[in-house]
A protein has these predicted regions:
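Membrane-water interface regions at transmembrane-helix termini and the short interhelical loops
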Residues: 4-20, 41-60, 112-120, 134-145, ...
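Transmembrane-helix boundary/entry motifs in multi-pass membrane transporters
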Residues: 20-25, 54-73, 104-106, 113-122, ...
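Membrane-embedded translocation segments of transport machinery
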Residues: 161, 165-168, 172-340, 345-364
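Hydrophobic alpha-helical membrane-embedded segments
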Residues: 33-43, 76-80, 130-142, 258, ...
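Interfacial loop/helix-cap signal at membrane boundaries in integral membrane proteins
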Residues: 14-18, 91, 97-120, 280-304
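N-terminal alpha-helical transmembrane segments of multi-pass membrane transport
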Residues: 1-107, 232, 255
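Alpha-helical transmembrane segments
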Residues: 22-36, 119-135
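Hydrophobic transmembrane alpha-helices that form the core helical bundles
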Residues: 1-7, 71-91, 125-135, 143-147, ...
């Protein structure tokens, strides 16, 4: 329906987003922090030694391939699109600017811009993915249950209740995945069309300053075929090969920026932004601004709805898809190793990416 009536669909989805933000924004926001805390509690020595599988099971993939596949499943076009755009956007406006604690487009706002950027791509989104993947892997490989979203729920319910709720849970997971993938593809095809236009200069790719329908259609077909070929080749072949290539190209791009970019400035932002983020992650993760009659309150609420709550809903919508994949490739890993590989390592990778590439853009 949205594809046939995009304007009406956009209006309805804007209304739904505003409704969720107003009535359930606090729940969406608090869920992310809860997942991070639950994962950090799982790395206590006794729990960290538990293997996701039988004690004799060993990992199917090397650490590099395992991390590459998890990182590629959890993030992609968003990091490419927003590695420069988001730090620049927050440098111009963020809650600290709205509250008057820092000044827009001034040096005192740099650390604040990065702490909000790192909040959106740090422990919280990876925690959402990781806790779903860990619970699925635990019940699938240690309790011999099917590797489905319903398994953790049916394990704690009676057989009758489990059968009843299982179908609903799986259906909700499928719907959430479709919505999450739809958002990602929307960003991806726009970026692909604009990028090809910048490289080739082909006019048919852009119409009235936006990607043309023909360009979007071609981009969707291309991405769909690439995804199909990757999936049909299997995890051990095509997906692993593409993930390794993706990781190698990511490191190559980072190396280019380290050599030719604003390395000293990026390093300064990495340290300052990371310290600011770690010292305030608790406060940033529980503060929910409500829209009242004051202009400041409305500005804070609008900013949080457009950024934080939108991101959290996006990450949570993707958790069934990404969580299943993380569980599939993590058999034989210990919980401690899993937490490091699924939340800490990718968070640091995102921090480095945004600080090195985004820092170069800010320095310019």
């Amino acid at each position: 329906w949205a594809s046939l009536a995009p304007d009406a669909g956009a209006i309805l989805m804007d209304i739904q987003a505003a409704t969720i933000s107003y009535f359930r924004g606090w729940y969406v926001y608090a869920s992310g922090l809860f997942m991070v805390i639950a994962l950090l509690l799982a790395v206590v020595p006794k729990t960290a030694r538990i293997r996701l599988g039988a004690e004799s099971d060993r990992p199917e993939f090397s650490r590099f391939a395992w991390f590459s596949m998890m990182f590629g499943a959890g993030i992609g076009v968003g990091m490419l699109t927003y590695s420069t755009a988001e730090p620049l956007a927050h440098f111009a406006n963020n809650p600290d600017v709205i509250l008057g604690a820092t000044t827009a487009l001034e040096r005192d706002n740099l650390a604040a811009a990065y702490k909000w950027t790192l909040l959106h791509y740090g422990l919280t989104p990876w925690g959402c993915y990781a806790i779903v993947g860990m619970s699925l892997a635990y019940f699938a490989y240690r309790r011999n249950m099917p590797l489905t979203i319903r398994s953790p729920f049916t394990a704690v319910l009676s057989a009758e209740s489990g059968r009843r709720i299982g179908g609903v849970v799986d259906a909700a997971a499928i719907l959430a995945t479709i919505i999450g993938i739809g958002v990602t593809i929307g960003y991806g095809v726009n970026q692909l069309a604009f990028g090809m236009h910048q490289i080739t200069g082909w006019e048919w790719l852009v119409s009235e300053g936006r990607p043309s329908l023909t360009a979007l259609f071609v981009a969707v077909v291309f991405l769909t075929l690439a995804a199909m070929l990757s999936a049909l080749s299997g995890i051990g072949r095509g997906i692993r090969w593409l993930s390794n290539l993706n990781m190698a190209l990511s490191w190559l791009l980072l190396l280019i920026f380290v050599i030719f970019g604003a390395t000293a400035f990026a390093g300064e932002m990495f340290v300052a932004g990371l310290l600011e983020y770690l010292s305030q992650i608790g406060q940033m993760s529980v503060t929910v601004w409500s829209s009242t009659d004051t202009p400041t309150a409305r500005a804070l609420s609008d900013w949080q709805s457009a950024w934080n709550i939108f991101y959290w809903a996006w990450w949570i919508a993707f958790t069934p898809f990404v969580g299943l994949f993380l569980a599939r490739v993590s058999r034989g890993r210990t919980i401690g190793e899993y937490v490091i590989g699924a939340i800490l390592a990718p968070s640091l990778m995102c921090f480095a990416w945004f600080c090195i590439i985004g820092g170069t853009a800010l320095d310019l």
